[in-house]
């Protein structure tokens, strides 16, 4: 697996034909064992994701509402303020893909907000 942008904020590359440019912050190469996700478990409500969020968001609740497609609640919880640092996912002892869901919620909510302005 090849990740462009580093271990925390990087994104998996679909193929290796993506060019590396001056602004590229790095490439991370993972073997099969390192790139396999551990199975996700139920949230244990430890609050570690909230404690590490530099924006003061509640990643666990945002993920819950993204899964439920409750976009109004995601907007009220300021999902658009997420800087996508990945600290929440990295810290989660239940191995929940918090950032993946937050990115979906953020993209959807920002689309809704743009359509309101038009």
Question: Can you say where each PLM-predicted feature lies in the sequence?
Answer:
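Redox cofactor-anchoring modules in respiratory/redox and cofactor-processing assemblies
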Residues: 1-94, 99-118
């Amino acid at each position: 697996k090849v990740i462009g942008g580093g271990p925390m904020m990087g994104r998996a590359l679909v193929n290796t034909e993506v060019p590396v440019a001056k602004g590229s912050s790095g490439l991370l190469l993972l073997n099969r064992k390192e790139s396999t996700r551990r199975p996700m478990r139920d949230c244990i409500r430890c609050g570690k994701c909230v404690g590490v969020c530099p924006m003061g968001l509640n990643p666990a609740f945002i993920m819950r509402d993204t899964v439920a497609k409750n976009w109004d609640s995601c907007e009220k919880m300021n999902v658009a303020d997420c800087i996508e640092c990945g600290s929440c996912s990295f810290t989660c002892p239940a191995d929940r893909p918090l950032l993946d869901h937050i990115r979906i919620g953020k993209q959807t909510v920002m689309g809704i907000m743009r359509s309101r302005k038009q």
